Design a protein with these regions (language model features):
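Beta->alpha turn/N-cap motifs
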Residues: 34-39, 73-78, 86-100, 123, ...
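Short glycine-rich His-centered loop
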Residues: 28-53
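Pocket-lining segment of extracytoplasmic ligand-binding domains
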Residues: 118-203, 208, 213, 218-220
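Acidic, polar ligand-binding/catalytic clefts
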Residues: 59, 63, 71-133, 196-205, ...
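Periplasmic-binding protein-like
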Residues: 36-39, 113-121, 189-230, 252-274
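Ligand-binding clefts/hinges and TM-proximal coupling segments of bilobed small-molecule sensing domains
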Residues: 146-163, 229-287
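Extended ligand-binding regions for polar small-molecule ligands
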Residues: 52-65, 124-127, 132-133, 137-138, ...
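Bacterial N-terminal signal peptides
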Residues: 9-19
Length: 287
């Protein structure tokens, strides 16, 4: 099955104003996507719209599903975004961490990343990342986020300071309002500094897949999205230069996330090994 990869130039997708009150039509030429959280490396607001790993994944899904464009909307909370998918007001959301509770309300695609809850703090910290070391410490979190729930479960004695949005939580950490920031691995890594930050623990609390979600009744889009994500991972495994550039610019060795090529290959190999390989005409990249 041939793979169709979006040029990097289109990764900064244009935003078209969208009213969430309009149901997403199954036969629409527009793929309606909702952005839960404007956070690196999945989404970054630009002058013309959004760019990020989530945007690039949505471009692959757009092409596989035969849509002409992706139309983005933003929401004020994760719950509002979930509700938009559940009610069919939008088609899809990408970059969403898997939880068993959510899986009863929406369908998840194959994951294209792995996340988990970690802590961002100054490099000279005395906290070692164990639950005991967090006792009595104040940690900033996004209100009602999976990370806030995980931290409360693994470290009941921690003092969580909730913020309404990731931007507010990050600003509080950067200003020194909170000494520790708790959240998803990719988000924290993308906003960390190798010289001044520590990201703990080494193995995240509560690891989970990161994928896309669609309405429970939209099996056709779910299938197309899985094919698109599977093709992307297989093309990366096959050494396709364009795919490797697309993925690695956001989460690879030269990004703030800093995953190695071997690490990304291992993840994608694991996912494909429990599903199926997809044949792709890869254009080899230099190792």
């Amino acid at each position: 099955m041939p793979i169709r990869l979006a040029p990097i130039a289109v990764a900064a997708a244009l935003v078209t104003p969208m009213a969430l009150a309009t149901p997403a039509a199954a036969n629409s030429t527009t793929l309606k996507a909702v952005v839960f959280e404007d956070v690196k490396p999945l989404y970054q607001k630009t002058d013309t719209g959004y760019e990020g790993f989530g945007v690039d994944v949505l471009e692959q899904i757009r092409m596989q599903s035969g849509r002409r464009k992706v139309e983005y909307s933003s929401v004020d909370s994760v719950n509002e975004g979930l509700n938009a998918v559940i009610t069919g007001k939008v088609d899809i959301a990408c970059g969403v961490a898997f939880t068993w509770e959510r899986s009863t309300k929406v369908n998840y695609t194959l994951p294209f990343g792995i996340g988990g809850t970690r802590l961002l703090m100054a490099s000279d910290t005395t906290v070692d990342g164990t639950p005991d070391s967090l006792s009595g410490k104040t940690v900033g979190v996004v209100k009602d986020s999976p990370a806030s729930k995980v931290l409360k479960n693994v470290a009941p004695e921690v003092n969580l300071k909730p913020y309404n949005t990731p931007a507010e939580a990050l600003a509080a950490y950067n200003s020194g309002d909170v000494p520790i920031l708790g959240g998803g691995t990719l988000w924290l890594a993308a906003n960390s500094s190798k010289e001044t930050s520590a990201l703990l623990p080494f193995r995240p609390y509560g690891r989970s897949g990161i994928g896309c979600i669609v309405n429970l009744n939209n099996g056709k889009l779910l299938s197309k999205a899985n094919i698109a994500i599977g093709q992307m991972m297989q093309a990366y495994m096959d050494g396709d230069a364009g795919t490797r550039h697309m993925v690695e610019r956001w989460i690879g060795p030269e990004s703030n996330v800093g995953l190695t090529r071997v690490g990304i290959e291992s993840l994608y190999s694991l996912i494909l090994n429990v599903t199926a390989e997809i044949s792709t005409p890869a254009a080899p990249a230099a190792r």
